[in-house]
Amino acid sequence: MAWRALHPLLLLLLLFPGSQAQSKAQVLQSVAGQTLTVRCQYPPTGSLYEKKGWCKEASALVCIRLVTSSKPRTMAWTSRFTIWDDPDAGFFTVTMTDLREEDSGHYWCRIYRPSDNSVSKSVRFYLVVSPASASTQTSWTPRDLVSSQTQTQSCVPPTAGARQAPESPSTIPVPSQPQNSTLRPGPAAPIALVPVFCGLLVAKSLVLSALLVWWGDIWWKTMMELRSLDTQKATCHLQQVTDLPWTSVSSPVEREILYHTVARTKISDDDDEHTL
């Protein structure tokens, strides 16, 4: 069964000793470019830590180690392989990224004794990696990977004496970076607009300042012109008021001289008429 693109494969494998585990291989199928995640469960052991390993079978007697854990709850990785072990929960997780067709073959989940580093428990399975088709080579983002549901397959060989480990969540999101991936724009786009906004604010501030200076200059000139007109009107009015006494008021001496002149003229006229 070929898994759909963007969905990593999650397997639950129960490790146990014995020849029966060596004779059976769980068949797994995946597609090139995808990520394979295998969760190998085992019964909790004693106080001494037992290393966990992931190896690829080269022959009936040789298994090449790809990655090995070093201590509990610490991720170890080599190339495209990572491993994470949690002895308290009773499982360890192995991840293969960027699957290739040449990755097809037999693999082993193994537990090694701390004394002589020999294999104490193991499970064997066979992986088939098919070439990616045009329909599966689609762009993706980490958001798609998190939001999608991970398919789960349980591969537990039937045994009478095998003790089942406590159940744990069937889905563990494992970040991967497949080839030909296209990332969507993130928060970098708004950050790139910050200089543009700052430039607009500075330009608006400069224009506003220029308008204020221009308006202040016009207001000042207008006020000076109004003050100049008020000063000219006040000077003209004062001059008119000052000239009034000279044109409307005459002294008593002038009025007396004017009176005598008129009287003499009248008397002279009367004398002429009488002579005639």
UniProtKB/Swiss-Prot annotation:
Bias (Polar residues): 138-156, 167-183
Main location: membrane
Subcellular location: Cell membrane
GO CC annotation, single: plasma membrane
Gene Ontology molecular function terms on file: signaling receptor activity; transmembrane signaling receptor activity
Membrane-topology annotation of the record: Single-pass type I membrane protein
Membrane-traversing stretches: 193-213
Positions of the UniProt region annotated as Disordered: 138-184
Extracellular topological intervals: 22-192
CDD domains found in the cross-reference section: IgV_pIgR_like
Gene Ontology biological process terms, A to Z: cellular defense response; signal transduction
Segments forming domain Ig-like: 22-120
Keyword Transmembrane: yes
Leader sequence segment: 1-21
Keywords: Cell membrane, Disulfide bond, Glycoprotein, Immunoglobulin domain, Membrane, Receptor, Signal, Transmembrane, Transmembrane helix
Disulfide bond residue pairs: C40-C109, C55-C63
Purpose of the protein: Cytotoxicity-activating receptor that may contribute to the increased efficiency of activated natural killer (NK) cells to mediate tumor cell lysis.
Family: Belongs to the natural cytotoxicity receptor (NCR) family.
PANTHER family, per database record: NATURAL CYTOTOXICITY TRIGGERING RECEPTOR 2, TREM-LIKE TRANSCRIPT PROTEIN
Name of this chain's protein: Natural cytotoxicity triggering receptor 2
